[in-house]
């Protein structure tokens, strides 16, 4: 029998507000434990929460960017469970009347566009952090408790791990563009849970779903889904049944394994939050927020093609991250060859970012530094191939390109007399190739140029080398 | 009975309350009576009545997104029965 998977994703994104959702404590990441807390986010008796207006605006902004319907009337609810990371023993969230619903994201898989539905987006407060150190108990840091989150719940519209990966990439891209979240998975500002079940192809009934946790990267989501789908199919093919449970992705072993859950019953006894009043988003307010939406990826892509003459392929890659698009535009402001900038961003820059797993804003190279490097090439100070070496050094150390060129003695040899001496020596040392060239073998020329580059450690000016070499050989 | 014994046990478990067998029996009877009483409300026709989200008829009470100083950590931890390294200490949670 052939099986297909049904995948749904739940994404939690921390909102980029300055203060927490219900109190004025800072949302800054890190900080000494329990230094960003107050009686409100600790849920001390007698305190009352007051909703941060920006949380509503950011959630609506995300909802609009994700094609959602914005609820005119919305309210907060209490989700009850006991766990030490939750100081009040309930989380203030939204249950039956979320702020946004019925949106979608378009993804591209194998050249085809597919719409992935977004069921809902609601606002809620984050919980604290449990530290399991070498003590006889667990330690709790409530700095994160009360940081605003949006939870984005997809429809179970994905059928392959690749589609899940594409959905997450697109979602992150849009959230970054809307500037409501910085989406840093390593700091926990973007977190992903996924539900997956399998069923025979053609069946309309859903199989028993498994929830997967501990997914620390989009690749981990993809790998965990690949493993889990195979596991479920194997169980079914051997005549077994899938038991509904939460499983944890074990990255080092590359497997999913059963996990103990917080509340055995999944019985959260939601009820309306009596300490907070309903939220009404009028059409005027909604339109005001819509106007504050920055340029979205597909608009930016079209503009980059029209304004900078970038090929569609380049424009798509450069705008796939807002940070890269911003970096590009800053470079182009000072350097009038957009295609050269895009080549560098898609080439060396992306290669080193992939190798180091860094995002563009975590790299010490600034747009000004890249522009300086490009100008060094244009002015003949360094060759294009040496520039790659210089760039690698810039990427690793954050040093200015001209400093690196100076320190490492990488300046191009463009002095005709100096270069002629080196070339003469190469000609004397390679009589066979010289003879081949004179007998009409064009390839021998390339070999000789290579020898000159070798002798100068790549610093010879290529045009000048060619010119002098031809002169000397025709003597 | 409007509520079963096992439901009472379930609710008690969710609330982390521990009762003797006699107490469970007693509460099952008492809670059933309360639910029967409240069930009277079900006799009303609420077809065209909006569900109440809040008893006070106001909405959109917000604060601006401004950071104010948090509370001093020594004060925060003052009433905590167990603390360590600036954290609240709780019984070991095994993930």
Swiss-Prot record, chain B:
UniProt enzyme class: ligase
Reactions catalysed: L-glutamyl-tRNA(Gln) + L-glutamine + ATP + H2O = L-glutaminyl-tRNA(Gln) + L-glutamate + ADP + phosphate + H(+); L-aspartyl-tRNA(Asn) + L-glutamine + ATP + H2O = L-asparaginyl-tRNA(Asn) + L-glutamate + ADP + phosphate + 2 H(+)
Cysteine disulfide links: none
Keyword flag ATP-binding: yes
GO biological process, one term: glutaminyl-tRNAGln biosynthesis via transamidation
Keywords assigned by UniProt, alphabetized: ATP-binding, Ligase, Nucleotide-binding, Protein biosynthesis
The enzyme's E.C. designation: 6.3.5.-
Single annotated GO MF: ATP binding
Quaternary structure annotation from Swiss-Prot or TrEMBL: Heterotrimer of A, B and C subunits.
Family: Belongs to the GatC family.
Biological role stated in the UniProt entry: Allows the formation of correctly charged Asn-tRNA(Asn) or Gln-tRNA(Gln) through the transamidation of misacylated Asp-tRNA(Asn) or Glu-tRNA(Gln) in organisms which lack either or both of asparaginyl-tRNA or glutaminyl-tRNA synthetases. The reaction takes place in the presence of glutamine and ATP through an activated phospho-Asp-tRNA(Asn) or phospho-Glu-tRNA(Gln).
Protein name: Aspartyl/glutamyl-tRNA(Asn/Gln) amidotransferase subunit C
Source species: Thermoanaerobacter pseudethanolicus (strain ATCC 33223 / 39E) (Clostridium thermohydrosulfuricum)
């Amino acid at each position: 029998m052939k099986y297909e998977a049904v995948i749904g994703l739940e994404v939690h994104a921390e909102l980029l507000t300055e203060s927490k959702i219900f109190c004025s404590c800072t949302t800054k990441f890190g900080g000494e434990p329990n230094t960003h807390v107050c009686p409100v986010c600790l849920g001390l008796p007698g305190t009352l929460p007051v909703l941060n207006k920006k949380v509503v605006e950011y959630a609506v902004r995300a909802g609009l960017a994700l094609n959602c319907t914005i609820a005119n009337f919305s309210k907060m609810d209490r989700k009850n469970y006991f766990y030490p990371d939750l100081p009040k023993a309930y989380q203030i969230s939204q249950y039956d009347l979320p702020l946004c619903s019925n949106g979608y994201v378009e993804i591209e898989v194998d050249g085809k566009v597919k719409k992935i539905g977004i069921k809902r987006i609601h606002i809620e407060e984050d919980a604290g952090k449990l530290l399991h150190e070498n003590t006889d108990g667990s330690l709790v840091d409530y700095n994160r408790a009360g940081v605003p989150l949006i939870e984005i719940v997809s429809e179970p519209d994905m059928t392959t791990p690749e589609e899940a990966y594409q959905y997450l990439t697109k979602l992150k891209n849009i959230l970054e563009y809307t500037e409501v979240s910085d989406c840093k998975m390593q700091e926990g500002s973007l977190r992903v849970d996924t539900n997956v079940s399998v069923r025979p192809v053609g069946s309309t009934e859903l199989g028993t779903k498994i929830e997967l946790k501990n997914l620390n990267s989009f690749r981990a989501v993809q790998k965990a889904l690949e493993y889990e789908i195979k596991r479920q199919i194997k169980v079914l093919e051997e005549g077994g049944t899938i038991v509904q449970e939460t499983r944890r992705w074990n990255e080092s072993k590359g497997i999913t394994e059963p996990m103990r859950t917080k509340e055995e019953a999944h019985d959260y006894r939601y009820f309306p939050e009596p300490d907070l009043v309903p939220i009404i988003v009028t059409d005027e307010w909604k339109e005001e927020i819509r106007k504050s939406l920055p340029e979205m990826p597909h608009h930016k892509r079209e503009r980059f093609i029209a304004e900078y003459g970038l090929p569609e392929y380049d424009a798509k890659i450069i705008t796939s991250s807002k940070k890269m698009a911003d970096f590009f535009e800053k470079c182009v402001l000072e350097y009038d060859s957009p295609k050269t900038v895009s080549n560098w961003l898609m080439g060396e820059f992306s290669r080193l970012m992939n190798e180091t797993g860094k995002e563009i804003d975590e790299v010490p190279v600034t747009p000004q530094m890249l522009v300086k490097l490009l100008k060094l090439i244009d002015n003949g100070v360094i060759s294009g191939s040496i520039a790659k070496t210089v760039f690698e050094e810039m990427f690793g150390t954050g040093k200015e390109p001209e400093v690196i060129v100076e320190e490492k003695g990488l300046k191009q040899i463009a002095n005709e007399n100096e270069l002629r001496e080196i070339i003469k020596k190469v000609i004397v040392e390679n009589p066979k190739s010289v003879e081949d060239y004179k007998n009409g073998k064009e390839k021998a020329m390339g070999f000789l140029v290579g020898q000159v580059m070798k002798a100068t450690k790549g610093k010879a000016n290529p045009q000048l080398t060619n010119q002098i070499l031809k002169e000397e050989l025709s003597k | 009975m409007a509520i079963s014994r096992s439901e009472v046990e379930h609710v008690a478990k969710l609330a982390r309350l521990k009762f003797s067998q006699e107490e469970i029996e007693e509460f099952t009877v008492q809670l059933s009576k309360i639910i029967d009483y409240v069930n009277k409300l079900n006799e009303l026709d609420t077809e065209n009545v909006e569900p109440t989200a809040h008893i006070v008829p106001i909405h959109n009470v917000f604060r601006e997104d401004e950071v104010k100083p948090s509370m001093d950590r020594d004060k925060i931890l003052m009433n905590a029965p167990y603390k360590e390294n600036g954290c609240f200490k709780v019984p070991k949670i095994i993930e």
